[in-house]
Amino acid sequence: MPESKYRQQTIRAPRGTVLTAKSWLTEAPLRMLMNNLDPDVAENPHELVVYGGIGRAARNWECYDAIVDALTRLEADETLLIQSGKPVGVFKTHDNAPRVLIANSNLVPHWATWEHFNELDAKGLAMYGQMTAGSWIYIGSQGIVQGTYETFVEAGRQHYNGTLAGRWVLTAGLGGMGGAQPLAATLAGACSLTIECQQSRIDFRLRTRYVDEQAATLDDALARITRYTREGKAVSVALCANAADILPELVNRGVRPDLVTDQTSAHDPLHGYLPSGWRWEEYQKNAQSDPHGTMQAAKRSMAAHVRAMLAFSKMGVPTFDYGNNIRQMAKEMGVENAFDFPGFVPAYIRPLFCRGIGPFRWVALSGDPQDIYKTDAKVKEIVAEDKHLHHWLDMARERIHFQGLPARICWVGLEWRQKLGLAFNEMVRCGEVSAPIVIGRDHLDSGSVASPNRETEAMRDGSDAVSDWPLLNALLNTASGATWVSLHHGGGVGMGFSQHAGMVIVCDGTDEAAARIRRVLHNDPATGVMRHADAGYDLAVECSVEQGLNLPMVAATQGKG
């Protein structure tokens, strides 16, 4: 069978209440798969690429067609199995089992390298699923905006007396993930200068209001930043250039930003990071003709990029890795002190993870933005005392452009996820919203990932690389009745550096859905509290006691068992 990764076809999820599949439990994954490939959502939908270098929704177009057909036919007591973007089986299970189980990009550890993966990919035997690309719950750049916003806000608290007014962030990358940075900085009160080597990505971010302005030159960009910071305005500026050139130049000029980070697709040197002096078309061509040489050229440029970040850090500028593994790539090219600046999780986010707080997201399958606005109001009603969360929801409504099906994200923890899910399900039952809602999350969450250079960097007990935790998370979500569950490898930081799990559950207004929601939206964040309590974090232990978790070894350690 010929296999095609390119098709000139526009995919959009159906809207409204007319079903293509046999129930909302199978209509939901069908619509979310299609939504991942909506041209307003995906970076390169004609090649099935959703975000993050080559993060795909399906292995090839033949597989996509087969997945759509299988979901359309799937019965209420059947489960579809997806192996690296390919539908490989439909099995009889039961009504409360997941309707889809997904495994993407998983390799035996010794073979978990980009070189081996690329060989398999070329043979049509594997697919890189990133995190939410291959698990069909990507919602565009909004999916990471609040996490980036929370990171910048916490950096402001730690370094600048609680405010980023009059400050500016230097970063790079305006792809599916990096595109969130300028808007997050603006919402946090800071100016930003984001370097991006592809004009098309800048154009997209300007069109969707994630970036305010584009500068013509570096001098122009710096003049704008100087003017806006002096005036106390939070304005985002993009510059079309290569970060491997611009950051060293800024160091040479003695320019001093207030925060430095990066969200280029450095995790994938073959497809995601343009070598200095190359054009993008040249990069794509060389990736096919000379993959090893291309990867080495990209990593040499990353080394220059990281040396500049280290120089900023040495100046006293708060500098952090935003989870793209650029430090690792630089270290492999001889930058021995690449890890002298921290990752964003140990620096700013881990206390949230200890309480099971992470990226809770939901999507209106109706396609009606009013359904999201009604759920926004419901969140404010239930989480009544959290004014920081209310402020986020207000800013999100004002500034965030929906991509594809309307969606929202807000970071909430173990205490609230189940309550919100049950409330959404009741809204569907009562007709307050016009169609069912799906609830999911990023794989970047407190209990669903092992990634020693990102989410689990510098764990208190040294368990950074232990990947039992995401496996247990996936197993528990399956046992709890999530609508679909995914287990991936390599997301965010690339092959060999992470394992992670995802889940999505449908709120269709039924009593059966409510029972599943009670289990899934408690157990899923509870695994994060469990994981951090097991690692010895007092905040997580306290949360486990408050929420009544049964953690035998933690209880024994605390003298309670």
Curated annotation (Swiss-Prot):
Compartments where found: Cytoplasm
Main location (coarse class): cytoplasm
Catalytic activity: 4-imidazolone-5-propanoate = trans-urocanate + H2O
InterPro entries: Urocanase, Urocanase-like, Urocanase_C, Urocanase_central_sf, Urocanase_CS, Urocanase_N, Urocanase_Rossmann-like, Urocanase_sf
Residues that bind NAD(+): 52-53, 130, 176-178, 196, 201, 242-243, 263-267, 273-274, 322, 492
Pathway in which the depicted protein is active: Amino-acid degradation; L-histidine degradation into L-glutamate; N-formimidoyl-L-glutamate from L-histidine: step 2/3
Cofactor note: Binds 1 NAD(+) per subunit.
Molecular function via GO: urocanate hydratase activity
Cited SUPFAM superfamilies: Urocanase
Key words of the record: Cytoplasm, Histidine metabolism, Lyase, NAD
Cofactor requirement: NAD(+)
Active site: 410
One of the protein's GO biological processes: L-histidine catabolic process to glutamate and formate
Any one GO cellular component localisation term in the record: cytoplasm
Catalytic activity, EC: 4.2.1.49
Known function: Catalyzes the conversion of urocanate to 4-imidazolone-5-propionate.
NCBIfam families per record: hutU, PRK05414.1
Protein family according to the UniProt entry: Belongs to the urocanase family.
Name of this chain's protein: Urocanate hydratase
